[in-house]
Amino acid sequence: MKETDLLNICGVNESFDVPVKLLELLLSPNSDQLLEQISNVYGDLQIDEFNIYYQTYLSERGKLKQDYTPNEVGKLLGMLIGEADTLIDVCAGSGTLTINYWNEHPNVKVCCEEFSSRVIPFLLANLALRNIDGIVYHGDTLTRKYEHIYRLCKGDKYSTIQIVEESKPIEGAVIMNPPYSLGWNPMNDERL
């Protein structure tokens, strides 16, 4: 997928405008039309094309150490983890690990958690393009404080996305590649 493809689909001139516009379009009643346009330029649904786009144009690799999991690593992990009814992807990014697990287990329900507001639209688009059923928590995994919870429901071709108030806890196989470079100080952590 070329940068210009996504700029044209979202109707914006700059890559930094894509996340906000993409999320707006994904939550609109015409989201199927958007997903069809993306599908026409996306390429292979077996890999995470948004991973490459996001890292090239939007990630903060220096400041936030946003280096996302390569598709090859995601593929290996997807093959190694046993079958489960539900997959939980903590620090999901654009969804590379989830997509690769889904490639091996297409009936899995997913639960993704992601902190970054800029990558959430790409994660939602990736899941909806594949007609995946699941929940996406946008917020802090450690504190359990969320900006939004998104529910994806299978449709005829693409998942529909709705913002929901809450979701019951989910259990399942866990796959994750957290930002190991983030600093953490347990001194003032209430949990300890």
Question: Where is each model-derived feature located?
Answer:
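Class I S-adenosyl-L-methionine-dependent methyltransferase catalytic core
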Residues: 1-192
